[in-house]
Amino acid sequence: MLVSDITTGEVVKRAATGSLQDAVTAMHESDTSYCIVELDGIPSGLLTERDALDACRRSGRPLTAISLDHFATGFDVAVTPDKTVYYAVGLMVSHGLEALPVKDGLDIVGVLTQEDVMANLTNLTRETVNNLGHKNKWNK
């Protein structure tokens, strides 16, 4: 199963000049747990629900007073749509990520989340079992 099979095309984006309130509102309205932060129209960071909560806790300021530019720190890790979900999960686990940007060139075309993986766990398991069955046939 490929990353493109389980990520949606809708990506929530907000400018780094906006506030955390803007991003949290957009995330809530889109029923998603992440927001891409753009600096001058270029994807420059990934804000997750956990990041938002941590920023509130650390700063003690209202959401409207926290700028999104603090989250425009780049992408340490990303995956392309043609990679397997297993590969992407390996990246998420090894880097301690709850969400992974999906890039096509310089564009962010989606975000793979832990929720996406869990929602497709049955299909991933079925695919693994089928692949193991084929492997056993090939080895005969």
Q: Where are each of the predicted segments found?
A:
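Tandem CBS (Bateman) regulatory domains
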Residues: 1-10, 48-78, 84-93, 108, ...
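The conserved cystathionine-beta-synthase
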Residues: 13-31, 38-39, 78-96, 103, ...
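A glycine-centered beta-loop-beta connector
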Residues: 27-30, 35-51, 92, 100-116
